[in-house]
Each structure stands twice: as C-alpha cells, then as structure tokens.
C-alpha cells in the first residue's frame, strides 16, 4: 500500500526552504526513497505550507525518516519555521488521475 507523509509548517523564509530541499535532494541522489514530493501553500494563510511526500510503502517512509539526511532536513525545517511542525502519516487508500 502506498504511503504519504505531510509536513505542515509556517515560514516567511520559503526561499531558504527551497534551497534546503535542493540540498537534501543532492545529498540523497542515487539512494533517495521517496518517489514524489509536492509543496503547496495555503491561499488563506500565505505563510502556511504543506510538503507532501509519497512513498511506495509505509516501511519505505519509515526507512526514509530514519536516514541521517532526512533528520538533518527536519532539523533545518524546524529552524526556519515560525511554528512547530505538524507531521501526518497517511495510508493511500485510493488514487485517481482525473
């Protein structure tokens, strides 16, 4: 079963976020576990973002969470966030391309 993690955060430093994500992508090149990541911004709260990361399975998501580069990125994200991070772990029950 596919698995997704959502990280909700607020920041006024989105350019730093993007640079940090680019750095994580470079460090994990060749052994990256997630197969898709999408950053979304809340239209009603311009500094609120949701990073949605998709995995082939829950086990792969947990393996990714335990990797040093992922821990470093989470610490970086906490450092540039204006509030505490909210993590959601989701099983993908249905997926359709519309």
Residues covered by each model-derived region:
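Helix-adjacent hinge/juxtasegments
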Residues: 74-76
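Short S/T/G/P-rich N-terminal loop/turn motif that feeds into the first structured element of a domain
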Residues: 1-68, 78-98
